[in-house]
Amino acid sequence: MAFLASGAYLTHRQKVLRLYKRALRHLESWCVQRDKYRYFACLMRARFEEHKNEKDMVRATQLLKEAEEEFWYRQHPQPYIFPDSPGGTSYERYDCYKVPEWCLDDWHPSEKAMYPDYFAKREQWKKLQRESWEREVKQLQEETPPGGPLTEALPPARKEGDLPPLWWYIVTRPRERPM
């Protein structure tokens, strides 16, 4: 999985926290009854708390490695995956039913009055988008070589120091490749 490749860039604390959360999720798959799960979750928390203030980083790293190995051997063979999570049965299933943003333009003023904060921020966003559109298209045309690709492989529509365009995720790719 792509998100596991970034483990080298995590701090020790982040690695421990992620291990703890994964362990709790797998424990939830093992213990169906909530009271039983809560009891074992408290025991697991106590085991993590024992070494919370470990000052020796070599020892802390060794403890983390041992905990990762123990997790590997005790993990559930079919952990519960929430339906809307990546790998779940409904992940990205209902994206086609999401209402597009432009449909909110057709709301009656009395309907918009029920959500004044949202529509005030939305109007600011639309104004900013209209103001920056020409500048961003010009920048995109400057960065695209003549006869270059006109598909998804467009250059990034962002120069160093500029704010990211409000629409760049639709028509361009990010400047750096994600790791």
From Swiss-Prot:
InterPro entries the record matches: Complex1_LYR_dom, Complex1_LYR_NDUFB9_LYRM3, NDUFB9
GO biological process, one term: mitochondrial electron transport, NADH to ubiquinone
UniProt keywords, alphabetically: Acetylation, Electron transport, Membrane, Mitochondrion, Mitochondrion inner membrane, Phosphoprotein, Respiratory chain, Transport
CDD domains: Complex1_LYR_NDUFB9_LYRM3
N-acetylalanine: residues carrying this PTM: 2
Pfam families per the UniProt record, alphabetical: Complex1_LYR
Main location: mitochondrion
Keyword Nucleotide-binding: no
Subcellular location(s) per record: Mitochondrion inner membrane
Stretches for region Disordered: 136-162
Recorded topology in the membrane: Peripheral membrane protein
Gene Ontology CC annotations of this record: mitochondrial inner membrane; respiratory chain complex I
UniProt key word Transmembrane helix: no
Quaternary data: Mammalian complex I is composed of 45 different subunits.
Purpose: Accessory subunit of the mitochondrial membrane respiratory chain NADH dehydrogenase (Complex I), that is believed to be not involved in catalysis. Complex I functions in the transfer of electrons from NADH to the respiratory chain. The immediate electron acceptor for the enzyme is believed to be ubiquinone.
Family statement: Belongs to the complex I LYR family.
UniProt-recorded name of the protein: NADH dehydrogenase [ubiquinone] 1 beta subcomplex subunit 9
Organism expressing this protein natively: Pongo abelii
